[in-house]
Each structure stands twice: as C-alpha cells, then as structure tokens.
A protein has these predicted regions:
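Blade-level signature of beta-propeller repeat domains, shared across WD40, Kelch, NHL, RCC1
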Residues: 380-410
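The canonical Cys-X-X-Cys-His
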Residues: 40-50, 83, 87
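Beta-strand-rich domains and repeat architectures in extracellular enzymes and scaffolds
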Residues: 111-142
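Beta-rich, blade/repeat-based domains predominating
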Residues: 118-130, 161-173, 204-217, 247-263, ...
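Conserved beta-strand positions in repeat-built beta-propeller and related beta-rich domains
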Residues: 133-139, 176-182, 220-226, 263-269, ...
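Short loop/turn segments that connect beta-strands within beta-propeller blades
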Residues: 147-151, 190-194, 234-238, 277-281, ...
C-alpha cells in the first residue's frame, strides 16, 4: 500500500476536533461497529473513506494512533483502544508488491534500534562526524542522538511545541540544524547545551521547511515543499531569503549540494530536477523525459551526476546536468516499489524500496549496472531519507516502525 497520504493524515488531524458537523454528514460512509462514533467525531470530517481505506497493519494503526496523540488530537483515554480496534478491523493493509531480493557480491547486515518515544515518527537520519546517528522525531517534537556503540539514545526537546522536525544536517561546529516542518521555521541545536536557536520564515506562505543542507561557505539551504519555495539562511547575519520555484505547484523536496557549491533539488510535484545559483538565487529546471516521474530524493556521485529515486514509477535514474544525458533502470521490486531515500557510498548507489513488502535496501553498482538487495528486518516501513557514516555505511530512519537503522557493509 502507498504510504504517501500519511503526512496529510497527520496534518489534517489538527482540524478534526472542530469538524464534527461535517463528520456527522460523513457518518454513513463508514462501517458500523464499536469505535465508529469516536472515529466519525474526531476524524471523519477530515478523512474520507478512500483515504482511510488505504489501510495499515495492526501495528501500523497503533503507531498512527500514537502519532496522532503526540500531535494533540483529543482522543479520550477510554476511547483510544476501541478506536484503534475499529481501524484495525475495518481498514487492513492493502496488498503490496512482494520484495524481490537479489543476491550479489557484497556482504551487509542491517542493525536496528527502537527510538524511546512511541509514535515519534523518526523522519530523517543524520550520521555525524563523531560517529553518532541523529534523527528528527517529527511527531515527538524532539531530536534524538544514538550512540551506535552503546545503543544509548538521548532525546533533545525543542523550543516550540509541535515543531515537526523534518530535515537534519550538521554544521562545521557540530551544531545540528533542522527544519520545523509544522511551524514555519528552521532551528539550530547546540548539542553541548541543548539550546535551540530558531529562524522564523519571513513569508507566512513558507509554512513547511522540508529538506536541509549546508554548503561549503556555511550557508544553510532548505526546501519548502507545499510553499513551492527554496530558502537560504546566512547563519552570521540571521538573514533568511526565500525564492519561489518558477513552476507552480512543483513542490521542492529532496536537496543536496554538489562539488561546485550549487544546491540541487527535486521538484516532487512535477517531473523536474532543479538547481539554484548560490549567488543570484536564480533557479534552473531540468525536465525528466517521462512526465510521470516523481523523484523524492537524490544523491550525487563524485562526477556531480544526479541520481534519483523515482517514487512514482519504481525506477532508479541518472541525470547529467551538464550534457542533459539521462538513463533509467527499473527497481528490482517493480513499478510499485516506491524508491525513496538514496545515498552514494562505497562506489555504489544505495536506496530503499518503501512500497515493497518487506521494505528493502538496494545497492546498484554504476560500473556493472547490477543490483543487489536485502530485506529490512521486521519489514522496515518506511525509510524516507538516508545518510552515510564516516566509514561509509548507509544509515536509515524507519518512521512507521519507530526505528533507526545502520547498514554495516562488510
């Protein structure tokens, strides 16, 4: 089943408590049974039957409930379990494509850690220079730091409640920067003191800072997906500049910085990849050949070629920005495999298939053009971004199962 509506599901719950009039009208659309009235009163005015019918596993629905509670949805204590059981009974997970596991020459093992706050929804991971693994707890309103050697996780509360931390990056001084996806801000955490500095968006339309990266000059870049913007922060002056994408509803998403210091980003709402000039802030767009392409994340190889995970079509792709040359390969688990997070390390592209069951980690060797893949233990669900440790191992955050992962390449 597709996981793409989950963000909308969570965001809409903020309105559910005030939607009872609409919910009463929607009541006939939902199956009868214990828990129905709670669902109708709190959620039915915001979520139509088709969205909810996308379904989850029993544990998935329990996780969604914890996420909603973390985010302040006013479910009475005595109604939490009946509502959960109602969702489990009536909206099971829809069939998903079976993962295709391909053997190959590389040995790798996947290690997992459970994050301490239930329903945290760890969104983006970050491997830092000191060997730690950080993550954004999007629905706990916290950042977390894992020591992979000891397994100890420390959580850092943020200044603004329900910030919705999303993207995460480390600066040269060891500060941890993050995007406040729900509160129109970018933040900086000092891990030594726990102090948080916030940079508020100067335009109220820039409500959802998304992915974040830092260039070689220390400038902080970020996308704002639904605002259709790209932003830049000068940490020295605190100035925030915003630029609107030239294509309406293009939804700037994944973001990386190439070797020339140029930010490269995906436009998830259309079939485009774009760059932004760090001096003039002019945006240049590159259309992908297939109009149905919708990459979410991208990675760069040492030659600055752009590799992307085409979520909508189940492909891995390569785009040379200089020549315009383009090539694609179908992902092992097929057109509904939903490739998502992607990194380049140890001479290969590593990405995950978020639509396959179980979720997979896929390795692609650009020299031989051969794939190799591994099932994520426990099923995964769902890796939205990846990072790379100082010794070159891929790192994941598995949001729906509340886990962090490390792919130890032998």
């Amino acid at each position: 089943m597709s996981r793409t509506p989950l963000s909308a599901l969570i965001a809409a719950t903020l309105l559910c408590a005030t939607a009872q009039a609409s919910a009463q009208q929607a009541q006939p659309d939902f199956p009868d049974g214990p828990g129905k009235q709670t669902f109708v009163n709190l959620c039915g005015g915001c979520h139509d039957i088709n969205r909810v019918r996308l379904g989850y596993t029993p544990e998935g629905w329990r996780t969604v409930m914890r996420m909603m509670l973390n985010f302040g949805v006013p479910v009475p204590q005595g109604e939490i379990e009946p509502l959960t059981q109602y969702l489990i009974a009536n909206f099971p997970e829809r069939p998903r494509p079976a993962a295709v596991i391909i053997a190959g020459p590389v040995e790798a093992a996947i290690k997992l850690w459970q994050v301490p706050t239930p329903g945290s929804r760890p969104h983006d991971p970050l491997a830092t220079r000191d060997g730690a693994i950080w993550y954004t707890g999007q629905l706990s309103g916290k950042l977390g730091r894992l020591d992979p050697k000891s397994g100890v996780i420390k959580e850092y509360p943020l200044k603004t409640p329900q910030t919705g931390p999303h993207g995460i990056v480390e600066d040269k001084d060891g500060n941890i920067w993050f995007t406040g996806n729900h509160m129109s801000l970018v933040g900086k955490l000092d891990p030594k003191t726990g102090d948080v500095t916030e940079y508020k968006m100067p335009d109220p339309k820039a409500k959802d800072p998304h992915t974040i990266a830092i260039d070689g000059n220390g400038m902080v870049w970020f996308t704002a997906q639904n605002a259709n913007m790209v932003g830049r922060i000068d940490p020295k002056s605190g100035e925030v500049k915003l630029v609107t994408s030239p294509t309406a509803n293009s939804r700037p998403y994944g973001l990386v910085i190439n070797s020339k210091g140029i930010p490269v980003f995906v436009e998830f709402g259309v079939n485009k990849i774009a760059t932004i000039d760090p001096n003039t802030l002019a945006i240049k767009e590159y259309a992908l050949p297939n109009p149905a392409s919708r990459p979410r994340r991208l990675a760069l190889t040492p030659d600055d070629a752009v590799w992307y995970a085409d979520f909508s079509r189940g492909y891995l792709g390569r785009l040379d920005l200089a020549s315009g040359e383009h090539k694609e390969w179908p992902s092992p688990s097929g057109p509904q495999s939903q490739p998502y997070g992607i990194v380049f390390t140890k001479g290969a592209l590593w990405y995950n298939e978020s639509g396959a069951k179980p979720n997979t980690i896929v390795r692609f060797d650009p020299k031989t053009e051969k794939f190799q893949s591994w099932a994520i233990p426990g099923g995964g669900d769902i890796v939205r971004n990846m990072s790379v440790t100082r010794d070159g191992n891929p790192v994941t955050a598995n949001s729906l199962v509340n886990q962090l992962g490390l792919v130890e390449v032998k």
